[in-house]
Amino acid sequence: LKCYGIFRKIMTCPQGQNICEKFAYSPMHNGWMYSWGCTSNCHKGPLDKCCSTDLCNY
């Protein structure tokens, strides 16, 4: 599965990894924080976006 984010043109990942959506809990943001990052375990989430965690499915 190859999927890319909107930053694919300005962000490069190591070989075998893709740019994916990531969600992480951030107390500073008082909740879930959305970000992008490189990961090798992508799966296709909503709107054909690349996700790195199951949280992307909601």
Swiss-Prot record:
Protein name, per record: Short neurotoxin MS11
Keyword Secreted applies: yes
Subcellular location: Secreted
Residue pairs linked by disulfide bridges in the UniProt entry: 3-20, 13-38, 42-50, 51-56
Tissue: Expressed by the venom gland.
Coiled-coil features, chain-numbered ranges: none
Organism: Micrurus surinamensis
One Gene Ontology cellular component: extracellular region
Pfam families per record: Toxin_cobra-type
InterPro entries: Snake_3FTx, Snake_toxin-like_sf, Toxin_cobra-type
GO biological process, any: modulation of receptor activity in another organism
Molecular function GO labels: acetylcholine receptor inhibitor activity; ion channel regulator activity; toxin activity
Keywords: Acetylcholine receptor inhibiting toxin, Disulfide bond, Ion channel impairing toxin, Neurotoxin, Postsynaptic neurotoxin, Secreted, Toxin
Family affiliation: Belongs to the three-finger toxin family. Short-chain subfamily.
Function of the protein: Produces peripheral paralysis by blocking neuromuscular transmission at the postsynaptic site. Binds to and inhibits the endogenous nicotinic acetylcholine receptors (nAChR) in the human rhabdomyosarcoma TE 671 cell line with an IC(50) of 266 mM. Not toxic to mice by intraperitoneal injection or to zebrafish by injection at the back dorsolateral region.
